[in-house]
Amino acid sequence: MAANIIATKAATKMASKKEHQYCLLDSQEKRHGQHPFSFELKPYGQTGGNIIGVQGSLTHVIKMIVFPFMIPFPLQKTHIDDFIGGRVYLFFKELDMQAVSDVNGMQYHFEFKVVPVSSNQVELLPVNNKYKFTYAIPEVQYLTPIFYDLSGPLDFPLDTLSVHVDSLTNHIHLPIQNHNLTKGDRVFISGYKHPQTIESYKNNTIFIKCIPPLLSEKINLYIPKNRIRIPLYFKSLKTSK
């Protein structure tokens, strides 16, 4: 699926006009079957009063800006002190030709300070939220963000699960996966066949009881607390015609 790209006002210089585009990498919109997260930049149509997206890729990128965002605790971490040095680094695989290299030879584009938010999430605050490329990137069609700290790459609990339904009991069976679900967590479920679909439930046990009849025995379950949304802002050069 696609990452959201929102066009903003471009500069008016004729020699080398600058375009600014906002890009939201939403973990629930990642490419199917891709792990770690991988996104294809595709245009969206008009949604209500909001125009989302005007082009299918970024071209002549000269600067990238990131804003604060939240992440769930990685599978390797259980406490805020587990983040070595209180830092997390973000690297984009497709932009590996231009990146910062640390003393251990690992590359990154952004460094973040880790701030605790809850027992399930932390906020990442950019130490320097701008990365300027030495040479313009001709085209960016895919983005694959990779997170790590000084101990190595970080893996996250799944935010989307394909689940199965017991047609006799109308219970959703949770697979044994890294979903990190606990009692009282809020989830969203798709796949109902019901005029007034109920999309949110709290899991009281390892099963989630379904009230309306189901469209099929295969449905999707979304876990908001595990969702990651990376807000990025790109500056590009557009050659005048």
Swiss-Prot record:
Keyword Lipid metabolism: no
Superkingdom of the organism of origin: Viruses
Keyword rRNA-binding annotated: no
GO cellular component, one term: virion component
Keywords (A to Z) from UniProt: Late protein, Virion
Induction comment from the UniProt entry of this chain: Expressed in the late phase of the viral replicative cycle.
Family, similarity comment: Belongs to the asfivirus H240R family.
Protein name in the entry: Penton protein H240R
